Amino acid sequence: RPKLYLFGLSLGALGCEDSADLKTVFEDPIQGAVWSGPPFPSRQWADITRNRNAGSPSWLPEYRDSSMVRFTGQKNALNNDKRWGPIRNVYIQYASDPMTFFSPDLLFHKPDWLIGERGPDVSPHLTWYPIITFLQIGFDLPLATTPPLGYGHSISAANYIDAWIAVTAPTGWTDQDTARLKQLFADRPPPG
């Protein structure tokens, strides 16, 4: 069969994760996936983030040897010098995305993304308070797609390009090809 890659944005990432259960992947493996802005109920994303390598932040986790799954944000963090396995999965997420980092646990527990090094787009003035931070991030949910591209739940084309190149590893593709493709999208007006 032809190569099969999965894609999901937001709730699509949640559904896409569920469609690629482990048994199915073993029986008839996909080649990879790009999941962007995974919402907080995403079980696979939550498990990987919870079990990330020590020292890697929850907003940009490293998982095991990075051969099967990698995370990226505003800056390309896919570390293409590391060896990939036969299945390549990339999560695109921004630390300022309330869809990804909201949690009912915010009611009474300080989240990992506010402990230690913060994401580049999380205000240093954001302080966790029981109940209050839960409400603040909860109120951000309906506005998650209103920030400019590259912030919140507004994923930029450049980040998609980096992710798809990492996942598909197109033969003969060069850094110049990537730069040209990114420029093509940068020259287009934003959607909406």
Model feature map: region roles:
Residues 6-13:
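Gly/Ala-rich beta-loop-alpha elbow adjacent to hydrolase catalytic centers
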Residues 1-2, 21-192:
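C-terminal His-loop and adjacent cap/lid subdomain of alpha/beta-hydrolase
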Residues 13-19:
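Hydrolases whose catalytic domains are alpha/beta-hydrolase-1, hotdog thioesterase
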